[in-house]
Amino acid sequence: MAKIIRIKGEILGKDEPMVFTKEYNVVKEDDALETMYSEMGSKHSVKRAYINVLEVSEISEEDVQSPILKKTLEMY
């Protein structure tokens, strides 16, 4: 069964760290991390070594903050 994973982290190497929070509906926690590294790397042109993951947690559907993920969950 799919889980909702929230990843909090920061991107280093710029003038000041950029803090982010991402949420994913995935089967495994590793899938969420891989997707996050891929998205952040392509969107912000940073290598994985400059992405610092601060927290990875499983959350309930009620705790979802991402509007896109909320709409996706409502469809199912």
From Swiss-Prot:
Part of the 50S ribosomal subunit. Binds 23S rRNA. Signal peptide: none annotated. It holds the Pfam family Ribosomal_L18A. Transmembrane segments: none annotated. Disulfide bonds: none annotated. One of its GO terms (biological process) is translation. This is Large ribosomal subunit protein eL20. InterPro entries: Ribosomal_eL20, Ribosomal_eL20_dom. Belongs to the eukaryotic ribosomal protein eL20 family. Keywords: Ribonucleoprotein, Ribosomal protein, RNA-binding, rRNA-binding. It comes from Methanococcus maripaludis (strain C6 / ATCC BAA-1332). One of its GO terms (cellular component) is ribonucleoprotein complex. One of its GO terms (molecular function) is structural constituent of ribosome.
